A protein has these predicted regions:
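N-terminal membrane topogenic signal
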Residues: 1-4
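Membrane-proximal helix-loop-helix interfaces that form the catalytic/acceptor-binding platform
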Residues: 7, 11-327, 339-506
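A conserved nucleotide-sugar
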Residues: 330
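C-terminal beta-strand-loop-alpha-helix "lid" module of Rossmann-like NAD(P)-dependent dehydrogenases
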Residues: 334-335
Length: 507
């Protein structure tokens, strides 16, 4: 009990530290906009937009802290609570598999930089993982006791997952493989009625929303046409997940070896294969789905956040199996605690860097622009995805749920997006397109260029614009953890060709 309370205290401290010090990044600004509506307005929005990619539960919960007097804190409270509660929850969940791994799993999650980052992120990932753990905890309780009441609770938390994010659907589907898991050698095979009860109650809880969405569908577009990303090769996806969950090469190699050796040394090989199937099936399945149906969207480890507890459990069960197989080694080396030490050390290397750096310093960018903008200035961004964050920190909020940009085709048949707004009696226009930048300064206007690192390198080499600012974004949890989402600000002023900028390398 002392270790549990200590981990809970340390885990909360690590997840609360600097919680409101980091600027909102672009996805968190979407959370801000999506959570301004109360329950009634949420239902109205989904009736008009039934194909919106995110169901409403997380936004309804976040709305409890509206009007968001301090957004950097308010929209991160739910993830903070869920991330902290996940620490005692993984203790209980891991104990369902083997009491010997409950403390190592709990300690590992306490210091896991990846989980800490998502517990400080105003998105639904932390609460998804918590709901997922609770659902499987009661699932395992049913397998242990055969009591049907646990299936109803499992179904309830499956439904909460579904109402929080549609990305939980693979988790709900593939976690059914756990029906083949045997906690004891003498355990009876679960009855078909148990499986049907769980499925029936899950459908009972989620069908109202499915019926609502289907009945509201009037031919609205399903996939966002602006997403053109390639999911990439399968090996890259699997490596990316390992890279995020177990940082640095020594830990990646050790974890990969443990997963491979798990069926070799496990006393119950069937159970090890079941756990590995639960882990790998959704990753391979989602990748195949994107390939077969030409879904153009990146796949990130965050989409599999609900599987992190099973991943940790599999690692420590593998270590436990090796210790049981080689009892002589156990007298001198406790492999579980050696691995736990490596896990904690690897994450403690990352944590100081994570706390020191920003996710994406949109707030700092706008503070600088507010001091230097003149009437008639234009702001160009390499992608329109920058628009919501820039407008948010200028205090320009959408009239509805989201900003609506004007769009047209330029002379090169490229789509141009623009939004105009007034700041301190100055008319400012935001632009974004695939071509830049002479067309925006032909009238003598100054052009501020907002770019990421790779575009900034090209601009610095090939453009007469000068670098005016750098705004840190070294530790964003996006396509990988961490990703460098730093922002570089350039100024192109046709009336001042001798404008001075800052001299810094872009690496």
């Amino acid at each position: 009990m002392f270790i549990l309370l200590l981990c809970l205290f340390i885990g909360f401290a690590l997840r609360y530290y600097h919680l409101d010090q980091k600027s909102l990044w672009m996805d968190e600004v979407h959370t801000y906009n999506d959570s301004r509506d109360g329950f009634g307005d949420q239902i109205k929005f989904y009736k008009e937009n039934p194909t919106f990619l995110h169901p409403p539960l997380f936004f309804v919960l976040t709305h409890l802290f509206y009007p968001f007097s301090k957004p950097e804190l308010d929209i991160r409270i739910i993830p903070l609570i869920a991330g902290t509660l996940s620490i005692p929850m993984i203790y209980l969940f891991a104990r369902s598999f083997a009491p010997q791994i409950s403390i190592p799993c709990m300690v590992a999650l306490t210091f896991m930089a990846y989980h800490i980052s998502l517990s400080q992120d105003g998105r639904s990932y932390a609460i998804l993982m918590f709901f997922g753990m609770v659902s499987l905890y009661f699932f395992m309780q049913h397998l242990k006791t055969s009591k049907k009441k646990y299936l109803i609770v499992t179904a309830l938390f499956y439904a909460l997952l579904f109402y929080t994010s549609y990305s939980s659907i693979p988790f709900i589907l593939f976690s059914q493989i756990l029906w083949f898991y045997k906690l004891e050698d003498h355990q009876k095979t679960p009855s078909l009625s148990s499986f049907l009860i769980q499925i029936a109650f899950t459908l009972l809880f989620i069908l109202p929303w499915i019926i609502f969405v289907v009945s509201s569908y009037k031919g609205q577009i399903i996939m966002d046409p602006t997403h053109k990303e390639d999911p990439g090769p399968l090996w890259s996806l699997l490596y990316g997940i390992l890279h995020d969950w177990v940082p640095f090469a020594p830990l990646i190699i050790a974890s990969s070896a443990l997963l491979i050796l798990f069926p070799v040394f496990a006393k119950q090989r069937r159970n090890s294969l079941v756990l590995l199937a639960v882990l790998l099936s959704p990753m391979v399945g989602l990748w195949l789905y994107c390939k077969w149906f030409n879904v153009t969207h990146f796949i990130t480890s965050r989409y599999f956040i609900t599987f992190v507890p099973l991943f940790l459990i599999s690692l420590f069960l593998s270590l436990l199996s090796i210790e049981f197989r080689f009892e002589r080694i156990k007298r001198y080396l406790h492999l579980r605690f050696l691995f736990l030490f490596l896990f904690i050390a690897s994450n403690l290397v990352i944590l100081p860097l994570y706390y020191r750096h920003q996710k994406q310093d949109n707030r700092g960018l706008i503070v600088y622009l507010k001091e230097h903008l003149r009437g008639g200035d234009k702001i160009f961004t390499e992608t329109e995805s920058y628009f919501p964050a820039i407008l948010h920190y200028f205090g320009v909020y959408p009239q509805g749920r989201h900003h609506v940009a004007k769009s047209w085709k330029d002379s090169e048949n490229k789509t141009v997006y623009s939004i105009s707004f007034v700041f301190q009696n100055k008319n400012i226009t935001l632009f974004s397109s695939k071509t830049c930048c002479s067309q925006y300064v032909n009238d003598g206007s100054r052009l501020w260029i907002v770019a990421g690192k790779w575009t900034a390198k090209r601009i610095k080499e090939n453009s007469p614009s000068v670098l005016k600012g750098y705004f840190d974004g070294s530790f964003l949890n996006f396509t990988r953890f961490p990703v460098d989402a730093s922002i570089y600000l350039f100024l192109l002023d046709p009336k001042s060709p001798g404008e001075k900028g800052i001299d810094m390398p872009i690496e």
